[in-house]
Swiss-Prot record:
Location in or out of the cell: Cell membrane
Keyword Transmembrane helix set for record: yes
Segments traversing the membrane: 593-613
Species of provenance: Arabidopsis thaliana (Mouse-ear cress)
Chain spans, region Disordered: 937-966
Homology family: Belongs to the protein kinase superfamily. Ser/Thr protein kinase family.
Name the UniProt record assigns to this protein: Receptor protein-tyrosine kinase CEPR1
Residues bearing PTM Phosphotyrosine: 738, 775, 831, 838
Catalytic activity: L-tyrosyl-[protein] + ATP = O-phospho-L-tyrosyl-[protein] + ADP + H(+)
Gene from which the chain derives: CEPR1
SUPFAM superfamilies referenced in this protein's UniProt entry, alphabetically: L domain-like (SSF52058), Protein kinase-like (PK-like) (SSF56112), RNI-like (SSF52047)
């Protein structure tokens, strides 16, 4: 029987063999056609060696091509070849045996449709389309049962996330990072099917809702990244079942709440943990700090309490510890860093106390040491002098005592040393001359004594030097004039004596020079007038002799007050009641008398002529009388100038007429004034005291407070902060002279229809405003809080670059009782942070909230308070009701803007939502906002910065460490 059927088996085998050969032959014949299609539609040097028209060509030798034994293509890897153009459709119709398709890091046409045919590749195991920047919807992957690797990161996919992926049970690597244009979607319970998955990378891809408990079934996971999404609720304790996990990234999910699960401490292979910028509460589990392989622990910007577990000090692997902006108490582990290769430590803005850890840089690798704004006590350990790798050393605003170690001041790579606001004593170490890379040195408000060492001049990269409010004595070293990059020199509030060195005139980059409240004697060097721009304060010293004429004409006379032996030189052409005229030698007096007679005669003749003209021009008498009034009122003004600008103060006063009014605001009336030089300035006449019966003493107090604020504003130098030229003050009126902004303010541009701002311009405005506020918050000490961020206080120059205006003025005007558009506090309804409305206490996070409202204005085109939001609604509440669906998100966007901008606008909206969180600690800092907005730069826009890496590597640290503590 078997022999009888044998011929049929032979025939069947022969048929199948020939069929396979025929199929292979047919497929092999189709392959050249697809290579020709690729050659014709893709462009790049890498394909120049593809000779597709030669009949004898072996395609298997082409770049990126691999074949099996029958010559059938199995791998097509064109990654990183800088190709452009269109990838042809139907790749698997031509390559049916294809196992690997990698097209990552190319510049393919965004509208390419080839992706829709990919599910036909039933044998495909590895699909990589990362950083191709494709658009459109994603296909159904359910038929691709062989798929092991899928990487669709850094694209612009829209529509629904393909949940069918979670049925591909052989999947090992899943990456959809940075797809912010997808619809909001929730991680399904079916994720538990992916038991072979080692990498789940779903950062910034519109995930929302809770993290499912079933995620605990993915026991093969090595890397779990869900950062930058809208996840909410508590972190499930089942994550503690992921025994192979090495990296856990959940940061920037600001609706995550609850405590950190103790069970995470079960993950003995875990190396990196980042759950920053969320709403976590409770303490840091000891079990986490005891993990044997922990390298990175970042939990900053939460509401964590309690002490830092002592077990963290025993770690042998810890490199980066970032816990800033929490409510942590107690002491740092005393042995922190003694056994581990620490690179960065930032525990700033907590309530930590006790001594600083002595051996934190024992490994010799520490780059960043930041412990600002805590309650640390004791001295700075001598061992810190051996931290030769340090780049930033910031211990400001603590309770440190003792002397400054020589070694700390001679660190060869350090760029910032910040010791301000402590109780440090002793001299400035001479070793400061060895800090060749030092750019910023802050030592203000300590008890430092001795002299300023001349070795300081060796630190030629210094840009900022603040030694104010100490007990320094002796002369100002002439060698300071060698610090040619210096733009801030503050020595105020010491016991410095001798004369002001002429060499200071070499500091051509200087913006701020404050030598006030010392014991300086002698004359003021005439050549100091060469410093441009100038903000000078020499008040409260023992200076004598004439004030340089150029400084008088620059309106800087007030900067020399409380120097009773100073005088006004006759050549100044005017006198100031605060200073006497300088006495002239006898010979010059006689000559002066002759000149006085000649001038008197000239004035008499001129008076006769004027009288005649007035008789003939009686119709202009009212105007002339007004001029006389202005002229007389001029002498009642105090004038303070902050920049060199050529104008006669009388010009300003004469131009304050109705026809020059360009706007009214909560703080006053704004005039456009064209000077004789042709330059145009803006003059803001601040609202005067509303209570006319107020005591003169009260008025003087308020004016003094305003003057203090204005002098601070006048010292500011930043491209996104409006330049304040001058300030006029009297008991009844205050004038601010600003640079003129020809395109008005942002409110008018957005809401009055004067101009159409495309998204790219709006984004530019948002970044500029954020950079200006970041400067006020993070680059000044102490920080300046604006208190009244709103679109009317954002001015636009000729190129629509934004300039922040009116910062610091609001709180003084509130005391005057006249700011009609503000609430009881400084600030404007619709822009006020919720906690400010309750507590009346302004913080930098209040400014962040107000900026978030402005950003929403830019994105939606709507006003902060509008009837379209319904009863008791504002723009923040309205947006919060729309973000649960993709349709809702689209509905919030300004309909006047092009469809192509929607994705970029949604990216920016995510930033605005973070800024307007009701919990202040959840809001990012303005430095972080700048980075977030730069990351959201419209496609094709300027390359403002490189993309941040999504993981912490050995060679880098968090954005906060590298960018925000400046």
């Amino acid at each position: 029987m078997r022999l009888k059927n044998f011929p049929f088996f032979v025939l069947f085998f022969f048929f199948c063999f020939n069929s396979n050969q025929s199929w292979g032959l047919m497929s092999s014949n189709q392959q050249p056609q697809f290579f020709k299609l690729m050659k014709n539609s893709l462009f790049g040097d890498a394909l120049s060696t593809w000779n597709v028209y030669d009949v004898g060509t072996n395609y298997c030798n082409f770049t990126g091509v691999r074949c099996d034994g029958q010559g059938l293509v199995t791998d097509l890897d064109l990654s990183g070849l800088s190709l452009s153009g269109i990838f042809p459709d139907g790749v698997c119709s031509y390559f049916p045996n294809l196992r690997v398709l990698r097209l990552s890091h190319n510049h393919l046409n965004k509208s390419s449709s080839f992706l829709n045919t990919i599910p036909n590749c039933s044998l495909l195991r590895d699909l990589n389309m990362s950083s191709v920047y494709l658009k459109g919807t994603l296909p159904d992957f359910s038929q691709m049962k062989s798929l092991r690797v899928i990487d669709m990161s850094w694209n612009h996919f829209t529509g629904s996330f393909p949940l069918s992926i979670f049925n591909l049970t052989d999947l090992e690597y899943l990456n959809f990072n940075e797809n912010p244009e997808l619809d909001l979607w929730t991680l399904p319970d079916s994720v538990s099917k992916l038991t072979k998955l080692t990498h789940m990378l779903l950062m910034t891809c519109m995930l929302h809702g809770n993290i499912p408990r079933s995620i605990g079934n993915l026991t093969s996971l090595v890397d779990l990244e869900l950062s930058g999404n809208f996840l909410s609720g508590e972190i499930p304790k089942e994550i503690g079942n992921l025994s192979n996990l090495r990296q856990l990234e959940l940061y920037y999910n600001y609706h995550l709440t609850g405590s950190i699960p103790e069970e995470i401490g079960n993950l003995k292979n875990l190396t990196d943990i980042d759950i920053s910028v969320s709403r976590l509460t409770g303490s840091i589990p000891d079990s986490i700090c005891s993990l044997p392989n922990l390298r990175v622990l970042q939990l900053y910007n939460n509401s964590l309490t309690g002490e830092i577990p002592k077990s963290l000090g025993n770690s042998k692997t810890l490199k980066i510890l970032s816990l800033y902006d929490n409510y942590l108490t107690g002491e740092l582990p005393p042995n922190l860093g003694s056994s581990s290769p620490m690179i960065a430590l930032d525990v700033s803005e907590n309530r930590l106390s006790g001594p600083l850890p002595a051996h934190v840089c024992k490994s010799g690798k520490l780059l960043y040491f930041l412990v600002l704004q805590n309650r640390f006590t004791g001295s700075i350990p001598e061992t810190y002098g051996s931290c030769k790798t340090l780049i930033r050393f910031r211990v400001a605003s603590n309770r440190l005592v003792g002397t400054i170690p020589q070694g700390v001041m001679s660190l060869p790579h350090v760029s910032i040393i910040d010791l301000a606001y402590n109780s440090l004593s002793g001299p400035i170490p001479n070793a400061i001359g060895n800090a060749w890379n030092l750019s910023e040195l802050f030592m203000q408000s300590n008890r430092i004594s001795g002299v300023i060492p001349h070795e300081l001049s060796h630190s030629t990269n210094l840009v900022k030097l603040d030694l104010s409010n100490n007990q320094l004595s002796g002369p100002i070293p002439s060698e300071v004039g060698r610090l040619r990059k210096l733009n801030l020199l503050v020595l105020q509030g010491n016991h410095l004596d001798s004369s002001i060195p002429d060499s200071l005139s070499n500091l051509k980059s200087l913006n701020v020079l404050d030598l006030s409240s010392n014991l300086l004697t002698g004359r003021i060097p005439e050549n100091l007038s060469e410093l441009l721009p100038t903000s000078i304060n020499f008040s409260s010293n023992r200076l004598s002799g004439p004030i340089p004429v150029s400084l008088i004409r620059g309106g800087l006379v007030e900067s020399f007050s409380d120097n009773p032996n100073l005088c006004i030189p006759p050549t100044a052409g005017s006198s100031d009641l605060k200073f006497p005229m300088c006495q002239e030698p006898h010979g010059k007096k006689k000559l002066s008398s002759i000149w006085a007679i000649l001038v008197s005669v000239f004035i008499l003749v001129l008076g006769v002529i004027m009288f005649y003209l007035r008789q003939r021009m009686s119709k202009n008498r009212a105007v002339i009388e007004q001029d006389e009034t202005l002229a007389s009122s001029f002498f009642s003004y105090d004038v303070k100038s902050f920049h060199r600008i050529s104008f006669d103060q009388r010009e300003i006063l004469e131009s304050l007429v109705d026809k020059n009014i360009v706007g009214h605001g909560g703080s006053g009336t704004v005039y456009r004034v064209e000077l004789k030089s042709g330059e145009v300035v803006a003059v803001k006449k601040l609202w005067s005291q509303s209570n006319k019966d107020s005591a003169s003493e009260d008025k003087m107090h308020l004016n003094k407070e305003l003057k203090t604020e204005v002098e601070t504003l006048g010292s500011i130098r930043h491209k996104n902060i409006v330049k304040l030229f001058s300030y006029f003050s009297s008991l009844d009126c205050s004038l601010l002279v600003y640079e003129y902004m020809p395109n008005g303010n942002l409110w008018d541009a957005l809401h009055k229809g004067f101009v159409h701002l495309e998204w790219r311009t709006r984004h530019q405005i948002a970044v500029g405003v954020a950079q200006g506020l970041a400067y006020l918050h993070h680059d000044l000490s102490p920080p300046i809080i604006h208190r009244d961020i709103k679109s009317t206080n954002i001015l636009l120059d000729v190129n629509y670059q934004p300039k922040v205006a009116d910062f610091g003025i609001a709180k003084v005007l509130q005391a005057r009782g006249k700011d009609s558009t503000t609430t009881v506090m400084a600030g404007t309804y619709g822009y006020l942070a919720p906690e400010y409305a309750y507590s009346s206490k302004a913080t930098i996070k209040c400014d962040v909230y107000s900026f978030g409202v402005v950003l929403m204005e830019l994105i939606t085109g709507k006003k902060p308070v509008d009837s379209c939001f319904g009863e008791n609604k504002n723009i923040v509440n309205w947006v919060s009701t729309k973000i649960d669906t993709k349709e809702g998100l689209i509905e919030t966007l300004d309909k006047r803007l092009s469809e192509s901008s929607k994705a970029d606008m949604i990216n920016a909206l995510r930033v605005a939502i973070r800024c307007t969180s009701r919990t202040p600690t959840i809001r990012p800092t303005m430095n972080e906002v700048v980075q977030l907005l730069i990351d959201a730069t419209p496609q094709g826009g300027p390359d403002m910065t490189s993309k941040p890496t999504t993981k912490i590597k050995d060679s880098i640290v968090s954005d906060h460490l590298t960018q925000t503590r400046l």
